[in-house]
Amino acid sequence: MKKILILALTVIIASACSSSDDSGDVNTSEFEEITTILPQGKWFISRLIDGNSDKTSEFESFDFTFNTDGTVKAQNDLFTENGTWNYDNSSSDDEELVLQFGNTTPFDEINDDWEIVSISNSQIELSDISGGDGDLELLTFTKL
């Protein structure tokens, strides 16, 4: 009887202990605040580097307005380009800002799933490894 009682207690204690760890979630949300920061005001591209090429000047006259419905508008005095944006944390190793504009130059340069590097209320830093040539691309939005 004593052996059965000890065995039963051992089973109860063992089943109460769990090896699962909820802190090891595959998807992180470190940068989820991007969904509330981007729609607050207008932004401009303060840096766009594609490998060894600085393409920042191609966007110097454009202001970007990110809307809560996932649309984005890039606008200057003469031209407006509409696109979409979304935050994606479905990858197990990074969080991304996905930007999609038409294939109009120069906006085809920023159509990508950008890895979020850092976020503040005034600056968003992104990076990507180019699928074509493996070059590092850097994109920074700064709040106006």
Model-derived segments and spans:
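Lipid interaction determinants
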Residues: S18-N86, S90-L144
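C-terminal motif of bacterial Sec signal peptides marking the signal peptidase cleavage site
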Residues: I13-A16
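Positively charged n-region of N-terminal signal peptides that target proteins for export
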Residues: M1-I4
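Sec-dependent N-terminal signal peptides
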Residues: I6-A8
